[in-house]
C-alpha cells in the first residue's frame, strides 16, 4: 500500500500508452510464488494473464517492440536512456540500475550509495570547489520528504536542479522558491553576524548568493500538483514552507560548524556583488554611447555607406595590417571593416564585468549595436545582418 504514496503519476497510463504504440508487448510478473505472463499486440491482449510457473522472487519485466506503423524511426538513443537512468540512481541512493545495449554488447551500471552528494560531485567534476558538499535529508510532519545537496565552485553560473518524486522540474516551482529563500536568508544572517556587509560596503542579492552554486533539491510529496501535464513546474503550496524550514535549520548549522567553508562562500558572494555593481555601471556607460549614434562608433571601424542592415556586411579582421588591406579591397557601399586584436577575451569563462570592461569586446558591442545584458539586448537593432569573421 505504501509503494505508490510518492509516485510520479498514474503508472497504468504510461504502460497503456506504450502498449498502444507497440506491435508487441510482453509482461512477466513474479508475485505470490507464481510467474504470470501476458502478451499484447497493438494494445490488444493476445491471451489472458496466465500462470506459467513458480518462483520465490518478486518483480515485473516489461518488454515492448515499437510499432513501425506508428513511428518512422524506432532506434533507441542509449545516451538519453543512460542520462535518465543515472539521474534516477543518484536520486535513489543505493538503487542499482543496469542498462544493457545488446546491439553492441555494452553494459552501463549505475549504483550511487552517496545519492545526491554523488550527483553534485558528478556535476562539479573538473571544477575547483569552495566547500565540501553539504547534504541533508529531512522527513517533515506532513509526509513531505526533503533532500538537498549543494556545493559552490569557482565558476559564475548557477546550476540548481529540482525534482519531485524523481521527476525533474526544469521550471522549478515551490520547492525551488523555498530553497532559494532559505539559502539567501541563511547567508545574509551569517554575513551580518560576522559584520562582513558593513565592512565590505556591499549589498548582496539572491543572484550573488547563487553564483557558482551547484545544488540538487529533491522532494517526495504524497499528492503533488504541477502547472501542466508535463510536470515542469511544481505548484503544491505546502512544499515551500517544508523545504524552507528544513533548509533553514540544516544550512545555518552547516555554516556555524564549518567556518572556513562559510568564509570562502561569503568571499565569493561579496565578489559577485561587486562585479554586479561594476557591470551595472559599465552597462549604463554602454547605453549612453548608443551605437546608432555615429559619434559613438569605434574609431577603428570603417563603416559602410549602406544604412539598411539587411544589405550591410561587417568583416572582423585580425589586427591593423589586415584591416588596412581589407579596407582597400572592400566595397565601401555595403562592406564595413573592424580590425580586432588576434586573441581577445574568452567570454564563456569570464565574469560579466570583466567581459564588458574588455576594450575589444566593448568595441564589438558598440559596432554591432544591439546592446548587452538581459535588459539591454535587442537583436532588432543589429546594424549588420551579415557578419564575417
Swiss-Prot record:
Pfam families the record matches: DNA_gyraseB, Toprim
Catalyses which reaction(s): ATP-dependent breakage, passage and rejoining of double-stranded DNA
Record keywords, A-Z: ATP-binding, Cytoplasm, DNA-binding, Isomerase, Nucleotide-binding, Topoisomerase
Toprim domain span: 312-389
GO biological process, one term: DNA topological change
Record flagged with keyword Isomerase: yes
InterPro entries the record matches: HATPase_C_sf, Ribosomal_Su5_D2-typ_SF, Ribsml_uS5_D2-typ_fold_subgr, Topo_IIA, Topo_IIA-like_dom_sf, Topo_IIA_B, Topo_IIA_B_C, Topo_IIA_bsu_dom2
Site (Interaction with DNA): 343, 346
SUPFAM superfamilies registered for this protein in UniProt: ATPase domain of HSP90 chaperone/DNA topoisomerase II/histidine kinase, Ribosomal protein S5 domain 2-like, Type II DNA topoisomerase
PROSITE patterns from the UniProt entry: TOPOISOMERASE_II (PS00177), TOPRIM (PS50880)
Main location as per UniProt: cytoplasm
EC number assigned by the record: 5.6.2.2
GO molecular function, one term: ATP binding
The protein's enzyme class: isomerase
Location within or outside the cell: Cytoplasm
GO cellular-component term (any): cytoplasm
Further comment found in the protein's record: Few gyrases are as efficient as E.coli at forming negative supercoils. Not all organisms have 2 type II topoisomerases; in organisms with a single type II topoisomerase this enzyme also has to decatenate newly replicated chromosomes.
Subunit structure, as described in the record: Heterotetramer, composed of two GyrA and two GyrB chains. In the heterotetramer, GyrA contains the active site tyrosine that forms a transient covalent intermediate with DNA, while GyrB binds cofactors and catalyzes ATP hydrolysis.
Recorded family membership: Belongs to the type II topoisomerase GyrB family.
UniProt-recorded name of the protein: DNA gyrase subunit B
Organism: Acinetobacter johnsonii
Highest classification ranks of the organism: Bacteria, Pseudomonadati, Pseudomonadota, Gammaproteobacteria, Moraxellales
